[in-house]
């Protein structure tokens, strides 16, 4: 979509602007005291009406999103499915966790329970520390990585099916998976983002990655505004936003075969997108994350899909699942060994002082300026990004 005015320095995506406004509205409601939220509601209502009259579309959308977010948080409770609807999914989750534990030894079973079904309660502390130290803890959290494996399998199975039927089957399968995993924010985000391009294709529309990310955020925040404060929500969106902003141009500049360049650029951008949040929440940075991702990620889809298939077959007929399980154990041992080895390197995890929120926002602002969404000339983009990065790092010192 074209920008609404020559003076606006960014590509205008109504969904993105609405998501930013909604996020600010939720922050206002939580942080302002007394009559603060009411004053913010009145102020942004007036500003939104003024921008509407003046034809300032981005500002109008932003202000109205702030207003609707304030009203949403003030008037409605957080939404969740009734226990009567969730009961079958809870039973399915328990059955899958049980068969996972039967098919795989204790450590492997605990790892797969986290990777496949989102249950980290049995995960070994030392193994969790190894994945965190290697900078690949995202493998343990259900997210876009895992949805991409499921979607890839579904796409192959339904490759000869009409796109509308494929959309319906994929949506049903992915939302069932979300329900079994108890709707973690990162998995729900990935599911919605996966369905947006399919929906656009089914309707004959052009897909847009930025709008898909924003739509996923709006859906999650409408149902549960408190998700904005969830670390998993922040890390998930931080990574995918950075990938959307910088992965494509970085891929074009890397002198490697296309697939390798894409893997490297996605890993780099995912790392950049989570660096400020890792420093802010955990006061540490995984310095070897890029190397660990390139080493371990090729094993993950094989281990994930093979082990998931073994679990489903084990539910139907245990000997079949037991027959497949040894290959899954072998793949998991490779992942665990690689993560433990990388985490054992000196300085694999560096402790850093907690940055300020302003420093984090400046860091993300610099990435936004460097992205294709910023319409400034290349020289101005480079200077502005350098200034923002410098300010972000100076505030951390």
Report the location of each language-model feature.
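Membrane-interfacial loop-to-helix junctions in multi-pass transporters
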Residues: 105-109, 123-125, 162-169, 299
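Hydrophobic alpha-helical transmembrane segments
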Residues: 10-16, 85-91, 109, 116-121, 181-186, 342-363, ...
